[in-house]
Regions:
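Anion-binding (especially nucleotide phosphate/pyrophosphate-binding) glycine-rich loop
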Residues: 1-128
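Phosphate/pyrophosphate- and phosphate-bearing ligand-binding catalytic cores of soluble enzymes
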Residues: 5-7, 11-18, 56, 132-296, ...
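Phosphate/pyrophosphate-binding loops and the adjoining catalytic core of nucleotide-dependent enzymes
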Residues: 301
Length: 320
């Protein structure tokens, strides 16, 4: 069975919790229900697919149909399951909010691991014609917080209905300094996927707001990548700038460091605030923040970072 709601409030479907409405909301449980709805109902376009709603900011009422599958498995539950089985590859993804489907679309990642490192293939339904097909890891064309599912021609059209995983790691992924410190603290001989997962979760909990207490969309900005020449200019003024050299020679600079050094940790606009413990996150501090509050704070952050560092920040959160 499916449920179709008209002109409804969907703030509860997002982790930000700012006011949000849509012309239609379609909720269903299995693929047969979805097929029935697509055949029987006249659904206003455009279409928007929501997983766990953890990477969205509704800036105005959505005039189309929001698709929301009920009972989606959370990414963290999958991480816990694999870690309990002693399988390496998911431990660094522990604690990331949202569904496995949304995480794949976004190529969610943390501490040196991304969804591209664990996804084998995905099953997809084309909402335009009902066709079903399979995309391999390569077909997904994963990039930094990006995938083939986010392209203008596929977003809102291709719906992931199932995912299979094939983690490739044979041990802990230690490209991130924090993970290396975790392995050192517990000892290589005691390093199990579950032990690392618990440390990763504790680290996240120490810096990030609890989703059931404070609304947010997780990391609000992408970590900018700049050229070696631009990074040399940055080092002239800020020799302590943290950085990560990418495979193509570009330099990734942590957005959290830029925001912090711009003096914006804890900054507020209306009910929106830069999270004091992790400036990469914007939170609904009062529980009554509006999209206008968040956008005003976003503009302020972008302007001040650009002025101080000559670096343009790009939001990671999808603006609707």
């Amino acid at each position: 069975m499916y449920k179709l709601h008209r002109n409804c409030d969907i703030a509860h479907l997002t982790t930000f919790g700012v006011p949000a409405r849509c012309a239609a909301l379609l909720e269903w449980t299995d693929d047969g229900d979805l097929a029935d709805a697509m055949r029987l109902e006249r659904l206003p376009k455009p279409f928007l697919i929501i997983g766990g709603g953890s990477n969205l900011l509704f800036t105005k009422p959505f005039e189309g149909t929001v698709f929301h599958r009920l009972g989606q498995m959370e990414l963290d539950a999958v991480c816990e399951s694999y870690c309990r089985e002693g399988v390496w590859g998911f431990e660094n993804l522990s604690g990331i909010p949202g569904s496995i489907f949304g995480a794949a679309v976004q190529n969610a990642g943390a501490y040196g691991t991304e969804m591209k490192d664990v996804v084998h293939e995905v099953k997809v339904t084309d909402l335009e014609n009902g066709d079903r097909f399979i995309l391999s890891n390569r077909d997904m064309q994963f990039g930094y917080r990006n995938s083939a599912m986010k392209r203008p021609e596929t977003a809102g059209r291709y719906l992931i209905t199932d995912i299979s995983f094939r983690p490739k790691a044979s041990g802990p992924t230690m490209t991130h300094k924090a993970v290396r410190q975790i392995i050192e603290s517990i000892g290589t001989e005691n390093a199990t996927p579950m032990a690392v997962r618990e440390k990763i979760k504790a680290l996240r909990d120490s810096k990030l707001p609890q989703p059931d207490q404070t609304g947010s969309a997780g990391s609000f900005f992408r970590n900018p990548e700049i050229t070696a020449c631009e990074f040399d200019a940055l080092l002239q003024k800020f020799p302590d700038a943290p950085h990560f050299v990418q495979a193509d020679g570009r330099i990734k600079v942590p957005a959290a460091w830029l925001i912090d050094r711009a003096g914006l940790k804890g900054a507020t606009e209306g009910g929106a605030q830069v999270w004091p413990l992790q400036p990469l996150v914007i939170v609904n501090a009062t529980g009554s923040a509006t999209a206008a509050d968040v956008l005003a704070l976003e503009r302020r952050i972008c302007n001040e970072v650009a002025l101080k560092f000559n670096i343009n920040l790009i939001p990671e959160v999808q603006h609707i």
